[in-house]
A protein has these predicted regions:
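Domain-level signature for respiratory redox metalloenzymes
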Residues: 1-168, 173-319
């Protein structure tokens, strides 16, 4: 199965908020050991390279260009491309973006907000997002911490306004919509057949459309379908040929990978061998055809029949 890209919101916020945090032991009553004296950002860096958590962007290089580089250096198969990437990581010629989040090549550029009020709502420490993500007024009162990171590269001057484009799917003019460059009018709860939940309680709401979406609003499915269609059209000009992409996936629960690390040994520091899927994240080569993004979005892929479906270590056939 093709691994899905994953990202945790908490680490997205840590792209800039870590500058205002100190050492664990400074604000928590914890025993003195190598874990409690770490900085949060350093721990996140370790968790990514050891395969505990995902992070995007992955590296300081474009992964499409990275696979081309591997092929230009003699890699002919997917396994050889994986080995090329692995060797670059081991030699530290290829760097993790999480290890230097302030570097310009590691900045996220496009932010889609969907089903959440990320700015001033879901995101904790929103003043830091306003300052560093959007480059706008922030009412920030905190100053940079004197406890600098040890592994994550520290920049004395933090960049502001990392994002080039913020797009919000919304039916309310909340704070995220107010700060977005583009607001796509989304259908509200009773204008679509869907599942919905909130952060107020654990209930899942199965909703049925009472009326059709009003005015220019569209269902989430139709909005993403149009985005996929136009992306495919643009891809015919800029990414007309099939591409090979590199995807790093964390070790997942309910799989063999969750029991591969009995002890915490960091391959990045030479404490053990770097073995994808065991001592570190998995490395997968994925074939992508961006010109067919729309066709794939509206179709049921043939991998369903070949590989089946499943979750949490279970798999079932779909003949």
């Amino acid at each position: 199965m093709i691994p899905g890209e994953q990202l945790l919101l908490v680490k997205t916020g840590m792209r800039h908020q870590y500058r205002y945090d100190g050492q664990f032991s400074k604000y928590n009553t914890v025993p003195k050991n190598k874990w409690t004296k770490q900085h949060t950002a350093d721990t996140i860096f370790q968790s990514v390279r050891m395969g505990w958590m995902p992070f995007y962007p992955q590296f300081n290089e474009n992964t499409l260009e990275l696979s081309k580089e591997a092929q230009q250096n003699g890699a002919k198969t997917d396994d050889e491309i994986r080995n090329y990437v692995l060797e670059k990581l081991k030699s530290k010629k290829l760097h993790y973006a999480v290890g230097d989040p302030e570097a310009e090549e590691n900045h996220p550029k496009v932010w889609y907000i969907w089903r959440g009020n990320a700015i001033m709502g879901s995101m904790k420490g929103h003043e830091y997002a306003l300052k560093h993500y959007l480059g706008t007024h922030s009412n920030k009162i905190a100053t940079d911490s004197k406890d600098h990171t040890e592994e994550v590269k520290w920049h004395d001057i933090a960049p502001e306004g990392k994002m080039d484009l913020v797009v919000d799917l919304n039916f309310r003019m909340d704070s995220s919509a107010l700060y977005s460059d583009i607001v796509l009018p989304a259908a509200s709860w009773y204008e679509k057949a869907d599942l919905n939940s909130t952060d107020l309680h654990s209930f899942i709401h199965p909703l049925s459309a009472a009326i059709a979406p009003v005015w220019e609003s569209k269902t989430d499915w139709d909005i993403f379908k149009l985005i996929a269609k136009h992306t495919s059209e643009i891809a015919r000009q800029h990414l007309s040929e099939p591409q090979k992409d590199i995807v790093c996936s964390p070790l997942s629960h309910d799989t063999a990978g969750e029991i591969t690390q009995r002890h915490v040994k960091d391959w990045y520091k030479g404490e053990c061998e770097a073995i994808p899927g065991k001592t570190m994240h998995s490395i997968t080569v994925v074939d992508r055809d961006y010109t067919k993004l729309y066709d794939k979005y509206i179709s049921l892929g043939d991998r369903i029949k070949a590989s089946g479906l499943g979750a949490h270590g279970n798999n079932y056939r779909c003949d």
